[in-house]
């Protein structure tokens, strides 16, 4: 894990190394100051020697300035290294997510991925910044201050060897308890993100069903769970500060009592024992040693908080995409023919029954195919195997006579345009959204594609035309308008295969007919697969596939199915009756 995260330093590697070096310089100056202070008092003030006073005062000033300089440099380099590390980590995670298949996304959930890319990375950034500063400062301060105090008085320094193990025991008791709580907190953040995303995306539904109070109470329940867990963690961590203060004041009390006796016994003579200046230095070292332990405990707490985010981010970084391009992949799609050869598919190995079973189909290039079936009959699942959004569990899917697993994924998907059942538009202008299909498309090509999709008629009605701004998710256009824009975007790819997954359900029958007519006249060489609920949308298709419970119930054109399939006739008659009513 450490090796993988270390790769995220990249260009900030040396910056991350310079910060601890500067921190060591700062600590060295801080440890030197009490020694200079002792000499200032013992050999300057006590002996009324102004030359020594001025000399030691200058040394103190230089040490203080050097400490300030090293401290500022360390903080600056640490900040740059931590920020750069977080940027690279977020970059690597985001790029990994882009390679995920649908099944990888389903494994984590979108809300969890958002949490990991935002709050988890922020927590890791803070922990890393503290590590390269405090994790160096505290041990160095502890070691140098202890060595300096041992040089002054080994007898007085023995008090540290009692206090330090006691504080270590307190810390070791706190960390496991706190870790479990923080691990639970970050999982709860995923739930919080899910609630917020669902509420914001579905705010119109929430308001139409007057469910604001219910949503607020749901949000408050999760927020309270996070609050309660943080309170528990803080209550446990609160033990740390009193324990530290007890140790500090106990050490100072012991050093004051024993040290004062030693100063009196030596007559304030360094050659015979302890001096007043050295005793004051011992007080400073006591504070430095025990405060370094206090800061070290904070580092442990921060690292403990970061362990859960580290594990969660590591899961993203090491998750292997289920679908990858093979070596020596095919980089050209010959034509738009499609073959399903004894195809079965399960969304997971734990699924009780397959979503698709024993599917055998041949679709000639350039044909128009209608796909019909009840809700849950696996119509969408069938077409998602063509651009290899999922891999068939059994059998093979061929495009242009070649198994889809042999294609380069980018090449395959570039030749298969798919308008999903759930249409998605991104914030930006209509032009920017359309150019997702073809970044180099000219304005004339945009207009032509929109005319084929019957979108030009409403776009030109907007004051800003094709420069009209689309809100996130396309919230400022109607469902039918959104569908037509998505169809136009797909057409701009100039694909060999075009898949419309119930993508005209929100448009009227006249517009639907106009779109189908444009397809027939303008893109005859493109294989068109149209999933629809209305037989009227697909009855002119060359082939109609009727799906039932993951099986192909029947295949043929409209006239053939009307004669041979009772199931198809039943659907047709019910829809005809509904239209007459």
PLM regions with names:
Residues 49, 53-55, 148-162, 232-312, ...:
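Helix-loop-helix
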Residues 11-13, 77-78, 99-103, 119-128, ...:
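An intracellular "coupling" helix at the cytosolic face of ABC transporter transmembrane type-1 domains
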Residues 1-11, 113:
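A short amphipathic helical element positioned immediately N-terminal to and/or at the very start
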Residues 332-581:
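ABC-type nucleotide-binding domain
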Residues 14-16, 63-82, 133-140, 161-188, ...:
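Alpha-helical transmembrane segments of multi-pass membrane proteins
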Residues 10, 16-73, 77, 150-155, ...:
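Transmembrane helix-loop-helix hairpins at lipid-water interfaces of multipass membrane proteins
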Residues 47, 83, 91-115, 119-121, ...:
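Short intracellular "coupling" helices and adjacent cytoplasmic loop segments at the cytosolic face
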Residues 10, 21, 25, 29-33, ...:
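Hydrophobic alpha-helical transmembrane segments of ABC transporter permease domains
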């Amino acid at each position: 894990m450490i090796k993988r995260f270390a790769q995220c330093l990249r260009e900030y590697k040396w910056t991350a190394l310079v910060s601890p070096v500067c921190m060591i310089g700062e600590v060295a100056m801080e440890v030197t100051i009490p020694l200079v202070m002792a000499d200032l008092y013992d050999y300057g003030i006590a002996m009324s020697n102004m030359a020594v006073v001025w000399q030691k005062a200058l040394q103190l000033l230089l040490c203080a300035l050097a400490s300030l300089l090293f401290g500022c440099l360390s903080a600056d380099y640490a900040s740059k290294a931590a920020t750069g590390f977080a940027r690279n980590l977020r970059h690597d995670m985001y790029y990994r997510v882009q390679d995920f298949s649908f099944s990888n996304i389903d494994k984590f959930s979108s809300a969890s991925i958002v949490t990991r890319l935002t709050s988890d990375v922020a927590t890791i950034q803070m922990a890393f910044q503290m590590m390269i500063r405090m994790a160096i400062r505290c041990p160095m301060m502890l070691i140098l201050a202890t060595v300096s105090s041992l040089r002054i008085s080994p007898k007085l320094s023995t008090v540290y060897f009692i206090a330090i193990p006691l504080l270590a025991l307190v810390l070791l008791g706190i960390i496991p308890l706190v870790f479990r709580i923080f691990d639970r907190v970050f999982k709860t953040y995923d739930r919080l993100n899910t609630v917020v995303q669902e509420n914001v995306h579905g705010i119109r539904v929430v308001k139409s069903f007057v469910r604001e109070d219910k949503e607020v109470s749901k949000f408050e329940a999760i927020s309270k769970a996070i609050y309660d867990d943080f309170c528990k963690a803080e209550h446990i961590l609160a033990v740390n500060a009193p324990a530290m203060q007890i140790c500090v004041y106990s050490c100072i009390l012991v050093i004051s009592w024993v040290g004062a006796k030693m100063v009196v016994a030596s007559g304030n003579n360094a050659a015979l024992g302890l001096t007043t200046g050295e005793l004051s230095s011992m007080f400073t070292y006591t504070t430095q040693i025990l405060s370094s332990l206090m800061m070290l405990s904070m580092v442990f707490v921060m690292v403990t908080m970061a362990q859960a985010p580290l594990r969660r981010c590591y899961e993203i970084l090491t998750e292997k995409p289920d679908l990858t391009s093979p070596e020596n992949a095919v980089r050209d799609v010959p034509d738009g023919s499609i073959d399903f050869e004894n195809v079965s598919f399960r969304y997971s190995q734990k699924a009780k029954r397959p979503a698709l079973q024993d599917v055998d189909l041949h679709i000639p290039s350039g044909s128009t195919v209608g796909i019909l079936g009840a809700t849950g009959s696996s119509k969408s699942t069938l077409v998602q195997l063509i651009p290899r959004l999922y891999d068939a569990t059994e059998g093979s899917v061929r495009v242009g006579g070649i198994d889809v697993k042999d294609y380069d994924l980018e090449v395959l998907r570039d030749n298969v345009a798919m308008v999903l059942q759930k249409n998605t538009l991104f914030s930006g202008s209509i032009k920017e959204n359309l150019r997702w299909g073809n970044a180099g498309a000219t304005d004339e090509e945009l207009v032509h594609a929109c005319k084929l999709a019957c979108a030009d008629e409403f776009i030109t009605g907007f004051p800003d035309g094709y420069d009209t701004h689309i809100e996130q998710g396309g919230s400022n256009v109607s469902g039918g308008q959104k569908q037509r824009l998505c169809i136009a975007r797909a057409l701009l790819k100039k694909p060999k295969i075009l898949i419309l997954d119930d993508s005209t359900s929100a448009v009227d029958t006249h517009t639907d007919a106009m779109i189908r007519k444009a397809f027939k006249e303008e893109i005859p060489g493109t294989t068109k697969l149209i999933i629809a609920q209305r037989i009227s949308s697909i009855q002119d298709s060359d082939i109609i596939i009727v799906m039932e419970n993951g099986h192909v119930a029947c295949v043929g054109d409209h006239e053939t199915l009307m004669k041979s399939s009772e199931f198809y006739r039943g659907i047709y008659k019910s829809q005809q009756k509904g239209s007459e009513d």
